[in-house]
Amino acid sequence: MKIANGQTVIQLFERWSPKSLAVEGDKNGVLIGTLNKPIQRVLTALDVTESVIDEAIELGAELILAHHPIIFRPLSSIRTDTAYGRIIEKAIKHDLTIYAAHTNLDITKGGVNDLMADALGLKDIEVLAPTTTESLYKLVVFVPHTHTDQVREALGRAGAGHIGNYSYCTFNSKGTGTFKPEEGTNPFIGKQGALEFVEELKIETIVTEGQKNKVVAAMIKSHPYEEPAYDLYPLANEGETLGLGRIGYLHESMTLEEFAKQVKKAFDVPTARVVGSLETQIRKVAVLGGDGNKYMAHALRKGADVIVTGDVYYHVPHDALMDGLNIVDPGHNVEKIMKQGVKEKLEKLLKDKKYDTEVVASSVHTDPFTFI
């Protein structure tokens, strides 16, 4: 079996959901333990409670990948005679590593908010509250004609060359490369001390900030030269906008009451708080996992008929109603959708690299509320 170590697991995860996406002041990354160990099993969880710790121990998971940080505010002490202290003590005693992916997982493509939008069947989905725009880079590499297809394929597989809904986009131009292999080299073409003239193809493509290291590594691995010549430089073009929340359209309009029932079914919750006339027709829907109180204005500006979010304060709906915005609040816990979503994504990332590390979604229910 090929088992990934903790560093590898998190490197793969952060290529998809980099910590750099997180909002300022957020707590992300390793909060307890170390990544310097083999990881046979990863447990994905929304919250880290004592029951989740017990589940990880029972399953033999060495790493808990959670959405909500177990440590959010600075600690002045860790008292093992308190419930919170016992959780930390138990994690350390059983050599568990706890990693949090909070707002970066909300923001990243395919993360919490995309999972929520997909669960509701939305189409024409956009970002609700932009936080950043991806930086773009131009990668230029010079390849002998014998290996151009191989290098182009490696670039595309690594994610380079995406422009809108087009992939594998490159520009190719012919030219002549020159080089003289010096002492200690093992040239693919030519011999030491002799100036070589080689017909080469210049392949140009576009990569994002988050992709560039992976793409360059794939290019170097596929290139026949021991020292490939390439350029990587930033572009003034702006890449894709990333941010919190999503907004899109239902495939067909329905009443607010019908939509609220759909929300309950999609997120498997027993109840939802609804703000607005139940007969109102709903077509354009905003979603924001977690606490969406600060994002009502974003939903209004983008023309949403309703926003689906959690933890709505008492006075916020009064303003929303005056502005004509309906609200469905199924609770904060609907972010539990990330457990299965992250499991499937991380599982694929590991399998693509031929690792046998297992990923398990937590079965522990961590919603503190009971509905009667």
UniProtKB/Swiss-Prot annotation:
SS bond list: none
MF term (GO), any: metal ion binding
InterPro entries in the record: DUF34/NIF3 (IPR002678), DUF34/NIF3_bac (IPR017221), DUF34/NIF3_sf (IPR036069), N-reg_PII/ATP_PRibTrfase_C (IPR015867)
Cellular component, GO, one term: cytoplasm
Binding positions for a divalent metal cation 2 per the UniProt entry: H68, H332, E335
UniProt-annotated binding residues for a divalent metal cation 1: H67, D106, E335
Keyword Metal-binding included in the entry's annotation: yes
Entry keyword Hydrolase: no
Keywords for this protein: Metal-binding
Pfam family, one: DUF34_NIF3
Subunit structure: Homohexamer.
Family: Belongs to the GTP cyclohydrolase I type 2/NIF3 family.
Name this protein carries in UniProt: GTP cyclohydrolase 1 type 2 homolog
Taxonomic path: Bacteria, Bacillati, Bacillota, Bacilli, Bacillales
